[in-house]
Amino acid sequence: MSWRPQYRCSKFRNVYGKVASRENCYDCIPITKNVHDNHFCAVNPKFLAIVTESAGGGSFFVIPLHQTGRIEPNYPKVCGHQGTVLDIKWNPFIENIIASCSEDTSVRIWEIPDGGLKRNMTEAVLELYGHSRRVGLIEWHPTAINILFSAGYDYKILIWNLDVGEAVKMIDCHTDVILCMSFNTDGSLMATTCKDKKLRVLEPRSGRVLQETTCKNHKVTRVVFFGDMKRLLTTGVSKWNTRQIALWDQEDLSMPVTEEEIDGLSGLLFPFYDVDTHMLYLAGKGDGNIRYYEITAEKPYLTYLMEFRSPAPQKGLGVMPKHGLDVSACEIFRFYKLVTLKNQIEPISMIVPRRSENYQEDIYPMTSGTEPALSPDEWLRGVNKGPVLMSLKEGYRKENKAIYKAPVKEKKSLVVNGIDLLENVPPRTENELLRMFFKQQEEIRRLKEQLSQRDLLVRQLELELKNLRNSPKDS
């Protein structure tokens, strides 16, 4: 019988993080001070987008990826929102299209010129209104082009078909603020976490809840699908107030498959999963560490590999898509770290050390490409398809020919699931909401006072009528 080691040998056990040199970082960026638990950063092979601090509305920078170094204070911004920008996401199939959502209750679609911005951009190619409160999350469908999901503080998820510029579905099964949305590989399933302490697995087209559990010993904040492994991972806090991760079977959420405590820090844990290498990265908000694990279908499921440490705390992290990585350097993942203490964006490359300079096929399998598998109409009809795969062997040289043509919209009511979402224009910020509330309170008080006066007048008239009826008898 041959001898076998008790530990599992992994080709990723020596992966290390390499921080970009100072001249390859992005300096002097006024990163937003908003405390919303998002990354405030989005990146693709062309552009880097960062939500910035601004007065009188929300804005974000869009910087060509090669334009590193110091960013001028008067650098052009995307600044059309009337409230703080809370989330931004690049279209995975059209690299010049970015979506943003804001406290002004809107979702907006922007088209960035190839060379970047030369002046402030204030006009979006499409403005989407449907939420009655601020919109905190947006996600693109992973395989269908121009399908966008938005989650608002009205506890609703709207599904937008950007080809027609309208919400086509509404998911209203949540009873509190939605914290996170994640899709499986083909986008046929969606997992959500919510402030009501529930983890849900949904069929996104119908909004039907397939699995649901209340996490009693594990307060969930973030969730991520493990590709086609039929597993979910959540990050959160244990009943002892320690940061914790839990692995779930997507078809049975009655109890977690396994749980693991991470540390006693208080910052949110952001999970990132690489479906090609089956590696999980855990990055803590407010600290500078990134832990990474290898995921397997059998026990122990999670194998700890190593930890990247940095003294500079991170506010959020953007992630470069696989086709934007440097395969010649054996780079398998790249973060863009928001360092508010330095007003800096710091690229961090995760590298597999190899002596050979040849293409390493074992760490670069076929990966999700930039071609959509489905049109919006096909997906809405119920078709499911996995992503269109591409090879990274020749590097990413493809010129994306896909373009987005915004629909011409007429003013009309927006009816989703039998509910008119635009029957009344919603307040766009929290201050407007408070003003509207106090105005309504004053109007209610005034109406009650008028009603009381009219009740008194009615009683007086009834008494006079009674006296008139009795007067002939007295005569």
Swiss-Prot record:
WD repeats lie at residues 80-120, 130-172, 174-212, 215-258, 260-303. Keywords: Actin-binding, Coiled coil, Cytoplasm, Cytoskeleton, Repeat, WD repeat. Disulfide bonds: none annotated. Signal peptide: none annotated. Gene3D superfamilies: YVTN repeat-like/Quinoprotein amine dehydrogenase (2.130.10.10). The keyword Protein transport does not apply. Its main location: cytoplasm. GO terms for cellular component: cytoplasm; cytoskeleton. Residues 431-470 form a coiled coil. It is found in: Cytoplasm, Cytoskeleton. InterPro entries: Coronin, DUF1899, WD40/YVTN_repeat-like_dom_sf, WD40_repeat_CS, WD40_repeat_dom_sf, WD40_rpt. It comes from the Eukaryota. GO terms for molecular function: actin filament binding. May play a role in the reorganization of neuronal actin structure. PANTHER family: CORONIN (PTHR10856), CORONIN-2B (PTHR10856:SF17). Belongs to the WD repeat coronin family. This is Coronin-2B. It comes from Xenopus laevis (African clawed frog). The lineage of its organism: Eukaryota, Metazoa, Chordata, Craniata, Vertebrata.
